[in-house]
Design a protein with these regions (language model features):
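Short active-site neighborhood of thiol/selenol oxidoreductases, capturing the structured segment around
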Residues: 62-82
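Short, small/polar residue-rich loop motifs at catalytic or cofactor-binding pockets
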Residues: 43-45, 67, 163-165
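N-terminal targeting signals for export/organelle localization
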Residues: 1-47
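Buried hydrophobic packing residues in well-ordered domains
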Residues: 55, 74-77, 88, 119, ...
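Thiol-/selenol-based redox modules, centered on thioredoxin-like
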Residues: 157-199
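A short beta-strand-turn-helix
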Residues: 49-68
């Protein structure tokens, strides 16, 4: 997959400026925005309606009250997505019972192909505590906008692939953005970030 990965090394909100700079090019090419305008919204301020791979309706307000770990991707992704979902599964296993307190979600950026059933079949390969989310393109775009993430449909050889933000988003139980886990970030750094939002 041709991808422009979001490479971040933030440990907490104090490091989030690097995240904002990594996203700013596509959100404000011709206008100036404050760094705060480029951070993910608090979950309670997001506004989208998606469907889980189990067929349940999901809105961001449902997540408030528990820490959230979220990742954007798609099931046809050859490398970044299965690798990251495998890493997330490993983190959840390492966290033990504490992992049950997390909302752990995989939000597709390819709703055209990633139906509820496709997501269900795909996620059967990973930790069952990961919830897949799909919906209309408009609702996926609303979710991506709330997270201040990005995605792009890229034509390829008569078909297409998807570019997308590759980091894992972490939010505190009150819905405030906490940090990003970078693609392929070492477990010794990733797990403490997750434990901080659980504390």
């Amino acid at each position: 997959m041709r991808r422009r990965q979001l490479i971040l090394g933030v440990g907490d909100v104090s490091g989030a400026l690097a995240f904002t700079l990594g996203l700013g090019w596509w959100q404000s090419r011709n206008r100036v925005q404050s760094p705060a305008a480029l951070l993910p919204l608090p979950i309670g301020e997001m506004n989208f309606a998606l469907t889980s791979h189990l067929g349940e309706p999901v809105r961001p307000a449902d997540w408030v009250g528990r820490p959230t770990m979220a990742f954007f991707g798609f099931t046809w992704c050859p490398d970044v997505c299965p690798t990251t979902l495998s890493e997330i599964s490993g983190w959840l296993e390492d966290l033990g019972p504490d992992a049950d307190r997390l909302n752990t979600v995989f939000i597709t950026v390819d709703p055209e192909r990633d139906t509820q059933q496709v997501l269900a079949d795909y996620l059967a390969n990973f930790d069952p505590r990961i919830t897949g989310l799909t919906g209309s393109l408009a609702e996926v775009e609303r979710a991506v906008a709330g997270f201040r993430a990005r995605f792009e449909k890229v034509p390829r050889d008569g078909d297409y692939t998807m570019d997308h933000t590759a980091g894992v988003f972490l939010f505190r139980a009150d819905g405030r953005f906490a940090s990003i886990i970078d693609y392929h970030e070492d477990r010794s750094f990733a797990l403490p970030k997750i434990r901080r939002v659980l504390s």
